[in-house]
Amino acid sequence: MTFWNEEIETMPEEELKAMQLKLLQELVERTYRDSGFYRKRMDEMGVKPEDIKTLDDIRKLPFMKKTDLRDNYPDGLFVKPYDELVRVHVSSGTTGKPTVVGYTQKDLDMWAESLDRGMTSFGMTNKDMLQNSHGYGLFTGGIGIHEAATKLGATVLPTSTGNTNRQIELMCDLPVTTIAGTPSYLFHIADTCDQKGIDIRKDTKLRKAIAGGEPWSESMREKLQNRTGIKIFNCYGASEFYGPMFLECEEQAGFHIWADITLIEILDENDQPVKDGERGAIVVTMLQKEAFPLIRYRIGDISSLEWTKCKCGRTHPRLQRLSGRTDDMLVVRGINVFPSQIEAVLGEMPFLSPFYHLTLDNENYMDRLVIEAELNEESLTEDMVELSKMSKELDKRLKEVLNIKAEVKLVLPGTLQRFEGKAKHVTDNRKYD
């Protein structure tokens, strides 16, 4: 059995929780000192750093929500000046405003540490070659996994997204043993290999995969594993944390949440803690973040947490497969998409009415987003050139905001259903079985 940091990864639960308390107290003290946002919130609740005497006292602290990220755009939540930052990542926000996250060198080191523990736990070593099919750039997935694998000593093939034929060619020609990507893209690669007559078992050295960025079921994982011979390990994270952070070990029995890095609460609908193993809303506190503190952040995911020791020997809590969301965020091909973002873009277009509908499906395991937008009476025309111009303008703007390609359909006035109460704008037909 191999560990990246055996002393920490196998530390008894009591010692881990004592470490968590010390780190939490230090976090609250420095954040109260350095962050106007948190200091104001804590003062409003009558809480001081010295009030945090036990781990249960975390419930005295205020929650942080996604709207707080929007309201403090771009850098109102930073507690370090830019000359102390080494990187900034940007991801989509709830109203078209992106979320801007700053990183010190220690932040990047801690991010890589978390991933390296996870990569080691499922058997990845410096002898592996990782084909990284996550997007690079402002998105955290590609660079985060790349740097962690490099620190591990593995060889990285930075293919990024797209150009599937080229990716498969390299996968066959080079000694690639591990691939990272979204579940839907891994299915797409498998489909394309079948079409080309390529047997992944025989024609490649690929045996492991890291899958993250979008939901999928256990039965889907089993289908892909049986089909390809690849053992697939799920990954969980978010840009607000650092990026992708937590992986499954060889047992595939949940995400190992490193207790010295992250404190996760699971709360019921009344914001009370649930029993160990019960499902509820995930609330995240990052214990060692420097540039962009995160205390009691409502990420919006639903899951359960177990502190039982894993068969792999690791003692840290395990987060189980996500079972839903507490908000209206959609995850499409690994990208966070909010209906409010789309609504804002549609509102910019003078030729559209306020009525729209989103439909999602995942035929052939690849997410497909169709946006139906209703023309207004003033813009109604039979001029195909003009209609094409409108469609292209809308298509371009949506791609700029969403960072993914959607299928846009302009429909006649009165086509879309009207609702007397709250309008239903989304139909999600995706199946994960």
Annotate the PLM regions.
Residues M1-E7, A18, M64-R227, F233, ...:
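Active-site phosphate/ATP/adenylate-binding loop shared across adenylate-forming ligases
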Residues M1-V90, T95-E113, R117-S121, N270, ...:
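Nucleotide 5′-phosphate-binding alpha/beta core
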Residues K53, L174, T204, I230, ...:
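Structured loop/turn residues at beta-strand edges in well-structured enzyme cores
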Residues T164-R166, E240-F241, G414-R418:
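A short acidic, often aromatic-flanked loop/helix-cap motif at beta-alpha or helix-coil junctions
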Residues I179, Q288-L402, G421:
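AMP-binding/adenylate-forming catalytic core of the ANL superfamily
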Residues R207, W216-K309:
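Conserved AMP-binding/adenylate-forming
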